[in-house]
Amino acid sequence: MKMMKGQVVLNMPAEKAWEMYRNNEIISKINPELLSRADYIQGDGAPGSLRLFKLGPGVSNYVKESMEKIEKVVSGRSVTYEVIGGDLKEMYDPYRVTFSFVPTQGNSNKCIAEWKAEFEPSAPATPPPEQARDAALRFLESFDNFQLSY
């Protein structure tokens, strides 16, 4: 299985970033250009739940929506999804993403937000999901600006 990852430093505690990521109402307002809506369509965010992400106009030429099944949750730290429907599922099978929020050492008011994907291209010519990584990191960077407004 291939892997790709990236990370950004956020100027907020990991717990706050975690709460923002897990709350559909908040996450849908952080950066509508990249993510216009998130809904748990089955479950409440625990393993086995299904979450639908509707992507915004900034990435809709690449991915319009993604249906994800939550596989693992480490409360306050990370969530791992397997993409089970949408555009990414057609390009990669499997496609598994982990978002994690880890406090920085020596400063509890900052955290490292990491995006990691494990994937197999569905066709030999399918490129790595660099656009997905770049969009995810831009979205995570938006957390800092959003937290100032709510």
What does each model-identified segment do?
Residues 1-46:
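Hydrophobic ligand-binding cavity/cleft-lining segments
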Residues 6-8, 65-72, 95-105:
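Hydrophobic/aromatic beta-strand elements that line small-molecule binding cavities or substrate pockets
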Residues 25-29, 38-90:
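Glycine-rich portal/gate segments that line the openings of hydrophobic small-molecule binding cavities
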Residues 2, 47, 62, 93, ...:
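Residue-level preference for beta-strand/loop junctions
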Residues 34-35, 141-150:
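Short, highly charged C-terminal tails/helix-capping segments
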Residues 14, 43-45, 71-78, 100-112, ...:
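A short, structured loop/turn motif at beta-sheet edges
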Residues 80-138:
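Beta-strand/loop substructures that line and gate deep hydrophobic ligand-binding cavities in soluble
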Residues 17, 51, 70, 81, ...:
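Structural signal for hydrophobic/aromatic residues that build the beta-strand cores
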